[in-house]
Design a protein with these regions (language model features):
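Patatin-like phospholipase
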Residues: 1-39, 47-275
Length: 275
């Protein structure tokens, strides 16, 4: 009898577009996860897949946007939490550019529903409770506010208030939430897109790039410690470390770089499910 599996999709900004290659590989295998857990970009892509979109449909949606910069800019304008001039204010409190909930409305496929209960695959979303200093696990109720909370990167996106909790990006506490899937399937698969270390780059990043890179470094450290204390059954790592967190307009290049992960996933997952 074939075993069931659950899928954890990690955070990492634009690198998370590599998750699409993983979903395409599952479609090619004819396999669907029993449950999905996601953080940040992993939550967004996981929601689209859980809503019934195929990996290829998600790819088409992303590439259509990435190849139309005017449309991307138009949608970004609609997500503003304030004026773009606020970016240059000294107080970070007024420097937030994007309303995370508006972002989800603008940049998610129309097929993504309003409520967790309408999804075809159970989905768990990770955000961070800013004042309780712990992760927030969201799996029922309104879907898009939960997604917004999971991607609400401080200084870039406004925090989201849910049930009297102030929530920010889930990557601050749990960038790869595989442990949330234990006991929900026979096999747990985690997709880590934090990127391998590199000694090749020597360029000095600008302040925003440095901030975002720091978040990724911290997330990588959190994930490494979690794996030490109890690894999932399978971890796959698309080779997308050369891309920066905001390289969304390089979607085609990210997807090309992620393509080799398909063969690895198919071979290793098939062995686990049939073993």
């Amino acid at each position: 009898m074939t075993k069931s599996f659950a899928l954890a999709l990690g955070g990492g900004g634009a690198r998370g577009l590599a998750h699409i290659a993983v979903l395409e590989a599952l479609d090619e295998m004819g396999k669907r996860p029993a449950a999905i857990a996601g953080t940040s970009i992993g939550a967004l892509i996981g929601a689209a897949y859980a809503a019934g979109l195929s990996g290829k449909a998600i790819r088409r949606f992303v590439l259509r946007l990435a190849h139309d910069r005017a449309e991307v800019f138009r949608r970004l304008i609609a997500t503003r939490a304030g004026t773009f001039a606020n970016l240059f204010n000294l107080g970070f409190g007024s420097a937030t550019l994007v309303d995370a909930e508006k972002f989800c409305q603008q940049f998610l496929p129309d097929q993504v529903p309003e409520d967790f209960g309408e999804l075809e695959i159970p989905l768990t979303i990770i955000a961070t409770d800013l004042y309780r200093r712990q992760q927030a696990v969201l799996s029922s109720g309104a879907l898009k506010p939960a997604l917004a909370a999971s991607i609400a990167l401080p200084t870039v996106m406004r925090p989201v208030v849910l049930a009297d909790r102030v929530l920010i990006d889930g990557g601050a506490t749990n960038p790869l939430p595989f442990e949330e899937l234990r006991g929900r399937a026979d096999v747990v698969v985690a997709v880590d897109i934090s990127g391998a270390p590199t000694e090749e780059r020597r360029d000095i990043p600008n302040p925003w790039e440095c901030l975002l890179a720091t978040v990724l470094v911290m997330g990588n450290a959190i994930t490494a410690e979690k794996i030490k204390h109890g690894a999932p059954d399978l971890v796959v790592r698309p080779r997308v470390g050369a891309f920066r967190a905001l390289d969304f307009l390089q979607a085609s290049a990210i997807l090309r770089a992620a393509e080799p992960v398909k063969a690895e996933l198919k071979e290793k997952l098939a062995a686990l499910l049939e073993g």
